[in-house]
């Protein structure tokens, strides 16, 4: 698995989720399974089967988070140069076909929130913008087809994930 770039915020958020799953959710589901098991016949015990399914989901998520954290590359976007589009950069682009402007900030895939302008570095838009500078024009394939964009500005701003 390749390294996964993320901010310290993203790393801490994943650590908190992992801790919660291991220390709260996993013990809780073990108790639920024991209670369901005490109700008798396991073949037709929907409560037991639901709890086992939930346990499998929790264990899979614990494994997934463990892998993500093991492969995490924590990056402080403020420490990077932002003369070209890179991780943590904010970029203002102009759709040359529609004359609409957009501002995006490139973050890790686990931190993305497109409605807040936070897009994953692995998204098609981010991939097309990476390494480009102000004034560059890029062609990006979107669901509605090929679109031409001009990069108006590349800058750094503090990334606000919540609130």
Swiss-Prot record:
PROSITE patterns: GREAB_1 (PS00829)
Alphabetical keyword list: Coiled coil, DNA-binding, Transcription, Transcription regulation
Highest taxon above the source species: Bacteria
Signal peptide: none
GO biological process, one term: DNA-templated transcription elongation
Similarity field: Belongs to the GreA/GreB family.
Protein name: Transcription elongation factor GreA
Organism, scientific name: Helicobacter hepaticus (strain ATCC 51449 / 3B1)
């Amino acid at each position: 698995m390749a390294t996964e770039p993320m901010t310290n915020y993203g790393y801490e958020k994943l650590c908190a989720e992992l801790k919660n799953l291991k220390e709260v959710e996993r013990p809780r589901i073990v108790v639920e399974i024991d209670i369901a098991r005490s109700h008798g016949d396991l073949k037709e015990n929907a409560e037991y089967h639901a709890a086992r399914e939930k346990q499998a989901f929790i264990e899979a998520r614990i494994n997934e988070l463990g892998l993500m954290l093991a492969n995490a590359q924590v990056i402080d976007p403020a420490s990077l140069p932002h003369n070209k589009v890179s991780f943590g950069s904010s970029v203002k682009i102009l759709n040359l076909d529609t004359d609409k402007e957009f501002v995006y900030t490139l973050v890790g895939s686990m931190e993305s929130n497109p409605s807040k302008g936070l897009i994953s570095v692995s998204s098609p838009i981010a991939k097309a913008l990476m390494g480009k500078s102000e004034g560059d024009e890029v062609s990006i394939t979107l669901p509605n087809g090929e679109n031409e964009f001009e990069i108006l500005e590349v800058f750094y701003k503090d990334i606000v994930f919540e609130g």
